[in-house]
Swiss-Prot record:
Family per record: Belongs to the LDH/MDH superfamily. MDH type 1 family.
Gene Ontology biological process: malate metabolic process; tricarboxylic acid cycle
Catalytic residues as annotated in Swiss-Prot or TrEMBL: 177
Listed name of the protein: Malate dehydrogenase
């Protein structure tokens, strides 16, 4: 199985390359691409780690050599958030980057599963879908917004707050991947009993956790290391699914449009990518209201991406 990382010289990309070199199944191929000339050096650096994963690095304007025969493409290219910016401020730069890269994916490896990490994910996934559709190669089972970091943060914060073993915690997170569109379903967490006054502040902390890191890094970057771990977890689950194992992850995909054209919820991964989109289950009154309140924002984010490609 061949995995390509586009944006591999960045803060997320380098850490993601390291994690995948360590954790991909033996015999996998890892292909790193970035516009930055350092990229072959990143590959050389990571190649010295003794695992049975072959690695190559490519730099320059054209990602085509990195994409040839790729089964999975992970896109983390783009600019990162700085203090005072929200994910939508990134749109003007990152939208064009994602569009250009997806045009190359459509030409070179149209059957690959594509995981979009580049923010604003609510919008960049819609851009990717429209580009693939224009090229006549769109398969909604194979396009994903990587929202796994919201799940990781939810698991961590719940375990900390409740003094629980984090390895036993599973928190479904639905909606999108920014601000109010991030909705952790805390009412569905096993082993956790909630006080009335705990849910709203914890939900808000999960929604704003990215900003917490941006501010803590004081202009020196955004959440790169935890995002790389989230992307690695998602990619490894996807590889397992493509290999015929049954795995469930929350991810932002095009489903039945019940809430919005794209929506993050638990998805069973399989040999074609999305095997089955699972129901969100029973929501508490707080969650139901939060869901209804976020939908106009989420739909507007999606429409922005569609218009970017089609106008």
């Amino acid at each position: 199985m061949k995995i390509a990382v586009l944006g591999a010289a960045g803060g997320i990309g380098q850490a993601l390359a390291l994690l995948l070199k360590l954790q991909l199944p033996a015999g996998s191929e890892l292909s790193l691409y970035d516009i930055a000339p350092v990229t072959p050096g990143v590959a050389a650096d990571v190649s010295h780690i003794p695992t049975a994963v072959k690695i190559q690095g490519f730099a320059g304007e054209d990602p085509t050599p990195a994409l040839e025969n790729a089964d999975v493409v992970l896109i983390s290219a783009g600019v990162a958030r700085k203090p005072g910016m929200d994910r939508s401020d990134l749109f003007n730069i990152n939208a064009g980057i994602v569009k250009n890269l997806i045009e190359k994916v459509a030409k070179t490896c149209p059957k690959a599963c594509v995981g979009i990490i580049t923010n604003p994910v609510n919008t960049t996934v819609a851009i990717a879908a429209e580009v693939l559709k224009k090229a006549g190669v769109y398969d909604k089972r194979k396009l994903f917004g990587v929202t796994t970091l919201d799940v990781l943060r939810s698991e961590t914060f719940v375990a900390e707050l409740k003094g629980l073993n984090v390895s036993r915690i599973a928190v479904p997170v639905i909606g999108g991947h920014s601000g109010v569109t991030i909705l952790p379903l805390l009412s569905q967490v096993q082993y956790a009993e909630w006080e009335e006054d705990e849910i709203a502040p914890l939900t808000k902390r999960i929604q704003n956790a990215g900003t917490e890191v941006v501010e803590a890094k004081a202009g020196g970057g955004s959440a790169t290391l935890s995002m790389a771990q989230a992307a690695a977890r998602f990619a490894l689950s996807l590889v397992q699914g493509l290999s015929g194992e049954t795995v469930v992850e929350c991810t932002y995909v095009e489903g039945d449009g019940k809430y919005a054209r794209f929506f993050a919820q638990p998805v069973r991964l399989g040999k074609e990518g999305v095997e089955e989109i699972l129901p969100v289950g029973t929501l508490s009154a707080f969650e139901q209201k939060a869901l209804e309140d976020m939908l106009p924002t989420l739909r507007a984010d999606i429409e922005l991406g569609e218009k970017f490609v089609n106008n």
